[in-house]
A protein has these predicted regions:
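Jelly-roll (double-stranded beta-helix
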Residues: 1-451
Length: 451
């Protein structure tokens, strides 16, 4: 993790006697990575963490991918997903490969157990909902637009508050490093000598929210910890509460970071997506596209240029903002633009963007360095007309005809793209504070710049 910290009670040195009030020894646990040479924390438990009552395999977590040989643009609409399961069992993987799994969770039930992912780091982006993640390192309060990074091996329980009347059900995007690598700030943001965030980084230590008290639960009984490993979830039973740590220190722990605390980097000309990078792991990166001033050259084109990212697949999760520059895109949409074919602005959006001074977009992107494959769940939510949304509308005459449904890919033949696009622009274009988004216009307007 980014830097050293500590919480709770600790002895003066590592690996010395540290006694409980009853005279017994606290159980020290070195919780580390990369064979004792990677980020590590040292924890002190009331009970021996090795004391297990019983265990059994529960269910498989192996993901089945489909259409592995198909290369095309995809648009998955996640908002119709029905609440199911809890914050673990309710997760639905939509895209993935041997490096990362990307999905959405709309939980319906509370967790009645604790969970440990012993195979991967997890990064959640909270779209809707607030609550607390109770971890072995302490409690993390979270709310909308928080990233939550939970490193491999952390025991936790995620608890959502009941939404108030009229508020949307809890929902979060999830990215899991199934290749076993760690999700960390990009090295270029960090000092090589001190692990401190450098001055050019778009966020820093002050923006991270670390675990807080309560941390210690000194309880006896029957407690289940479900552990994900080897493509299985296993049930382990303990006679004591698994969150029994009285103190810890080190550089390996979970934390929260709110996307609104990301400070976008702006420039005279359009900047590439790595400018918005927030985290990275082996073979994938996570980026944050946030509201910001746009490029300020007098003749700037402020939307992305057409690009062929020949080594990456790109998934964008649309959080809020102005969706008019994307046909059919709405809140909660996930678009997949694969390596091998170029992608870029939709017809008419380049001209419409000229003169815009700012963008109110908010989106999370995951770029991978190996092809992504869809699951059956993604196929069931896929807009089959999305690849045709670039087909027409490149001239004023085509755009007018498309609105009348008289050209291929227009409103009639591309009903999903055009109809849904008009609906989403009206009903889901919301600004940061929930007000209607500003329409793109030639001078001083707002525009979305999603790539």
């Amino acid at each position: 993790m980014p830097y050293y910290t500590k919480l709770g009670s600790l002895p003066s040195k590592r690996h010395i006697q540290f006694r409980r009030p009853d005279g017994g020894l606290y159980a020290e646990e070195v919780f580390g990575t990369e064979g004792f040479v990677g980020p590590t924390s040292t924890l002190y438990h009331i009970n021996p963490p090795t004391q297990v009552m019983g265990w059994k395999p529960l269910y498989s977590t192996k993901v089945e991918y489909v259409e592995r040989a198909t290369m095309r643009m995809r648009h998955v609409k996640s908002m119709p997903m029905k609440p199911k399961g809890d914050p673990v069992t309710g997760r639905t993987v939509l895209f993935g490969n041997s490096d990362v799994e990307i999905g959405v969770c709309v939980p319906k039930e509370p967790m009645k157990y604790h969970f440990k992912n012993a195979a991967a780091d997890e990064c959640f982006f909270i779209h809707f909902g607030s609550g607390i993640v109770y971890t072995m390192f302490g409690a993390l309060k979270f709310g909308p637009k928080d990233y939550i990074v939970i490193p491999k091996g952390t025991i936790y329980r995620m608890e959502f508050e009941k939404p108030a009347a009229g508020e949307p059900a809890p929902r979060f995007l999830l990215m899991e490093s199934v290749n076993g690598s760690h999700i960390l700030p990009p090295p270029r943001y960090m000092s090589k000598k001190t692990a401190q965030f450098l001055e050019h980084a778009p966020y820093c230590e002050r923006d991270l929210r670390l675990p807080e008290l309560p941390m210690t639960f000194d309880e006896k009984g029957k407690f289940e910890v479900r552990i994900k490993s080897r493509d299985q979830v296993h049930s382990y039973m303990y006679s004591y509460h698994p969150l029994d740590v009285v103190g810890w220190d080190g550089c390996y722990y979970p934390y929260c970071f709110n996307i609104d605390d990301f400070s976008p980097i702006v420039a005279k000309h359009h900047m590439p997506p790595p400018t918005h990078q927030t985290f990275e792991a082996h073979n994938f990166v996570i980026c944050s596209f946030c509201p910001r001033p746009l490029d300020f050259h007098p003749q700037a084109i402020v939307v992305p240029y057409n690009h062929s990212n020949l080594d990456s697949d790109e998934v964008l999760y649309y959080v809020e903002g102005n969706y008019k520059a994307r046909r059919g895109i709405e809140q909660g949409s996930l678009s997949l633009h694969p390596q091998g074919i170029p992608h870029g602005p939709h017809p008419g959006t380049v001209e419409a963007s000229i003169g815009a001074t700012h963008t109110n977009e908010l989106a999370v992107m995951c770029d991978t360095f190996a092809p992504l494959f869809p699951t059956k769940a993604a196929i069931a939510l896929d807009d089959l007309n999305y690849p045709r949304s670039w087909e027409s509308g490149w001239t004023p005459e085509e755009r007018s005809a498309a609105m009348n449904g008289s050209v291929p890919g227009g409103a009639a033949s591309n009903r999903s793209a055009a109809k849904t696009g008009r609906k989403s622009a009206k009903s889901t274009a919301v600004s940061k504070k929930g007000s209607a988004a500003v329409s793109p216009r030639r001078s001083g307007g707002a525009v979305n710049t999603w790539s």
